[in-house]
């Protein structure tokens, strides 16, 4: 051992023991990187377990004009109180940042605080988000509205008649397809059905085309035309079976039984609405004629099938977001 005190720059053989460990969370003499959390990995995107301000991915958007965190059809168990402060720079009564349908903002992330999404001034959404019309724009990686990924309607593709199709159906289609394109449009379909004593309004024809093609292109091919033709024959036989007095109309009770035979059980309230809607007399007869019976069946069938796509457990309940709800209902309103 030398007579000199041990060096403070090292821990040579026989020297003093190393100094105590640095404080929790530090990395020696270097400061921890911004945003680090020690040895624990960062929570996954959208996790709400460790971040009280995080909005789960897929959460319901805030209603137009409401405070950013007002619950629009809140998910079960979501009892958070609405955020009472207005967004930075927003005028009284202005819509929430990002517009209707954007991810709601909440807490310090509105102002770009620690852990918040980077904000942009002026118009435009954040990186990866859909363009915004007002406010600060969407957050980093915010999902754009569903419609931006493409139309929900199916593409209309060429088809052929199924093997063994009735030659009369083939001849009917070919007579309507004057340009030999392999498709017939709404006017041509209306004329083709009239030739078989099936006269329908253009609205009913549009509903038929939508239900059998799942497309908003008002054309139909041989395969879909064949399915449509046989379905109409089936519905006509059902109408005649339940028109027991041969009046050419079916009343509320007969409509209930007819829909039940098609597999649709609707309540008396809905039955009254259907009869009021499709009664040509404006509700005086409280009965539906054949052509409107077809439109009524198309509406009930179409809405039920769209609902069952969401009700995968067949529980009688389903969850729709705003976009899906509008896309489900509007085709039956604007046909």
Curated annotation (Swiss-Prot):
Induction: By touch and during darkness conditions.
Functional description taken from the UniProt entry: Potential calcium sensor.
Protein name: Probable calcium-binding protein CML49
Pfam families assigned: EF-hand_5, EF-hand_7
Segments forming domain EF-hand: 164-199, 230-265
Pro residues bias: start-end ranges: 30-45
Lineage per the UniProt record: Eukaryota, Viridiplantae, Streptophyta, Embryophyta, Tracheophyta
Region Disordered, annotated ranges: 1-154
Gene of this entry: CML49
Molecular function (Gene Ontology), one example: calcium ion binding
Organism of this sequence: Arabidopsis thaliana
UniProt biased composition (Low complexity): 1-10, 46-63
């Amino acid at each position: 051992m030398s007579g000199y005190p041990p060096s403070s720059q090292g821990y040579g053989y026989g020297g003093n023991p190393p100094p105590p460990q640095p404080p929790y969370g530090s990395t020696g003499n270097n400061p921890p990187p911004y945003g680090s959390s020690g040895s624990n990995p960062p929570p996954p995107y959208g996790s709400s377990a460790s971040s009280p301000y995080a909005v789960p991915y897929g959460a319901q958007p805030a209603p137009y004009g409401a405070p950013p965190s007002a619950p629009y059809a809140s998910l079960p168990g979501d009892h958070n109180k609405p955020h009472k402060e207005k967004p930075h720079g927003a005028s009284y009564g202005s819509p929430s940042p990002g517009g209707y349908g954007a991810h709601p903002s909440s807490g310090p992330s509105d102002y770009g605080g620690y852990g918040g999404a980077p904000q942009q001034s002026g118009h435009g959404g954040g990186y990866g988000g859909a363009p915004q019309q007002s406010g600060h724009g969407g957050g980093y990686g915010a999902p754009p509205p569903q419609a931006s990924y493409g139309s929900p309607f199916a593409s209309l593709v060429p088809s052929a008649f199924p093997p063994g199709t009735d030659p009369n159906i083939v001849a009917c289609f070919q007579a309507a397809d004057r340009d030999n394109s392999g498709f017939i449009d709404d006017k041509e379909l209306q004329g083709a059905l009239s030739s078989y004593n099936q006269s329908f309004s253009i609205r009913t024809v549009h509903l038929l085309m939508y239900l059998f093609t799942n497309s908003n292109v008002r054309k139909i091919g041989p395969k879909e035309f064949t399915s449509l033709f046989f379905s109409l024959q089936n519905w006509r036989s059902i109408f005649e079976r339940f028109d027991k007095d041969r009046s050419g109309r079916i009343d509320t009770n007969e409509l209930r039984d007819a829909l039940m035979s098609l597999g649709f059980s609707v309540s008396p309230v809905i039955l009254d609405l259907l009869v009021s809607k499709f009664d040509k007399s404006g509700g005086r007869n409280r009965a539906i004629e054949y052509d409107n019976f077809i439109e009524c069946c198309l509406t009930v069938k179409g809405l039920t099938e769209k609902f069952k796509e969401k009700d995968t457990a067949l529980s009688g309940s389903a969850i729709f977001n705003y976009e899906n709800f509008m896309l489900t209902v509007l085709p039956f309103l604007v046909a």
